[in-house]
Curated annotation (Swiss-Prot):
It comes from Nitrosomonas europaea (strain ATCC 19718 / CIP 103999 / KCTC 2705 / NBRC 14298). It catalyses: 2 D-alanine + ATP = D-alanyl-D-alanine + ADP + phosphate + H(+). Belongs to the D-alanine--D-alanine ligase family. GO terms for cellular component: cytosol. Its cofactor is Mg(2+); Mn(2+). The lineage of its organism: Bacteria, Pseudomonadati, Pseudomonadota, Betaproteobacteria, Nitrosomonadales. ATP binds at residues 131-186. The gene is ddl. Gene3D superfamilies: 3.40.50.20, ATP-grasp fold, A domain, ATP-grasp fold, B domain. Mg(2+) 2 binds at E267, N269. This is D-alanine--D-alanine ligase. Binds 2 magnesium or manganese ions per subunit. NCBIfam families: D_ala_D_alaTIGR (TIGR01205), PRK01372.1 (NF002378). GO terms for molecular function: ATP binding; D-alanine-D-alanine ligase activity; metal ion binding. HAMAP family: Dala_Dala_lig. PROSITE patterns: ATP_GRASP, DALA_DALA_LIGASE_1, DALA_DALA_LIGASE_2.
């Protein structure tokens, strides 16, 4: 990369969401990669200073390594557009839609993309009504949170109530979702092209926050080991799921493949993790792209905003 073309780069990290600690890890990894690539890059934590300082400090573009609320929900993207600062990842609308699992599901269903059935919950929702609709077990999670925070698997009324309360601590929008038994997969999208699929095998329980970021027993396989034909079919559908939300630059589409080899798409992450446990760098490595090359390519795509 010709560093004169990108100028002074701010790596947004940390922030105010429940995923702050993961964002700090992602941001530091991104910052180190950019600096190794001789990019004039600096850390910028919006939790400790106003975004307008980006202009005062002379930044020319932004690498968004924020996760969750106020980072990948369109808020920061809107502020950066008002300041006319190019940034990585998707724009305002796509970021907001992808952050909202409820509205993502509505769009995907309208577009013919397979996603688990769901019911929106409130404090008056009855366990039996929801169980009759979705079957047991079922998943309860906040609609607008990432890293599986507030997510629980339930199969009885007592757990249903406690899981609802746990999810409601993160978001006023809570959904119950059909549980799909199958293989956990993720499809990374880079520059409108799918990368090799990553298969995720959890030792026990769900692929939750602990399993994602701290467990040493969670196993990842990339390439996934699926047949070439099935892999291509999933990648094509994942790319469509990415595009139909209006996503640009890069994203990570999560899904479950059931016993009939039918993919059920769960969500799209528009600012995926970039830690040592993260899946996009793993998929890129399988495609022959080093971590530093991946970070630089994502930054280069910011020129399209």
């Amino acid at each position: 990369m010709n560093t004169r073309d990108v100028g002074k780069v701010a790596v947004l990290l940390g922030g105010r969401s429940a995923e702050r600690e993961i964002s700090l890890r992602s941001g530091q990894a991104v910052l180190a990669a950019l600096q190794r690539s001789r990019v004039n890059a600096h850390a910028f934590d919006p939790a400790g200073q106003p975004l307008e300082n980006l202009l005062q400090q002379g930044f020319d573009r932004v690498f968004i390594a924020l996760h969750g609320r106020y980072g990948e929900d369109g808020s920061v993207q809107g502020a950066l557009e008002l300041m006319e600062l190019p940034y990585t990842g998707s724009g305002i609308l796509a970021s907001a839609l992808a952050m909202d699992k409820w509205r993502t599901k509505m769009i995907w269903q309208a577009a013919g993309i397979n996603t688990p059935d769901y019911v929106m919950l409130d404090a008056s929702s009855r366990f039996r009504d929801v169980a009759d609709r979705l079957g047991l077990p079922l998943i309860i999670k906040p609609a607008r949170e990432g890293s599986t925070l507030g997510l629980n698997k339930v199969d009885n009324e007592q757990d249903f109530r406690s899981a609802y309360q746990a999810a409601a601590e993160y978001d006023s929008l809570v959904l119950a979702e059909q549980f799909i038994q199958g293989i956990e997969l993720t499809a990374a999208i880079l520059d409108d092209m799918p990368l090799p699929l990553v298969r995720i095998d959890v030792a026990e329980g769900l692929y939750d926050y602990q399993a994602k970021y701290f467990s040493e027993s969670t196993r990842y396989t990339c390439p996934s080991g699926l047949s070439a034909a099935l892999t291509t079919r999933i990648q094509e559908q994942a790319l469509y799921a990415h595009r139909i939300l209006g996503c640009t630059g890069w994203s990570r589409v999560d899904l479950i493949l059931d016993e009939n080899e039918q993919p059920f798409f769960l969500e799209t992450n528009t600012s995926p993790g970039m830690t040592d446990h993260s899946l996009v760098p793993m998929a890129a490595k399988a495609a022959g792209i080093s971590f530093d090359e991946l970070v630089v390519q994502i930054l280069e795509l910011s020129c399209e905003h």
